Amino acid sequence: NKIICKLSVREKDKKMKTSSEYLKEANALVEKIDVEVGIDRHKSGKAIFIDVRDSADIASTGTIKGSLQIPRGFIEFAADESTPFYNKALSKDQEIILVCGAGGLAALTGKTMIEMGYKNVKNVGGIGDWIKAEGPVEK
């Protein structure tokens, strides 16, 4: 039994992913756009912007003007039409541009949304770069 137990633990360890591996997969799947491109898309009014940071972070820096605030930990519910938490502003065919603190959470969120059937999801990176580039912000 000890041998079987040790083998099971080793097999399990082989399948575990690190946060770096998750992020690498997300960055490979979700298109990263420059902040200038994001600002142009914002001006066009054709994209949905989502800030995936928590409310405390958003309160301290502000967010992209007109963006939805859907925390990373809630996106699976807000993006799923079958839940009572579905955000009706979301559309699987519309361009969705995600922002977070530095780009990592936006990438992970984008991967999740793509896996849920959203077809045009992009990552504009961190809010600091957006503010520095003088993109429209609201508090």
Named regions from a protein language model:
Residues N1-K15:
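Short, Lys/Arg-enriched N-terminal segments with co-localized hydrophobic residues
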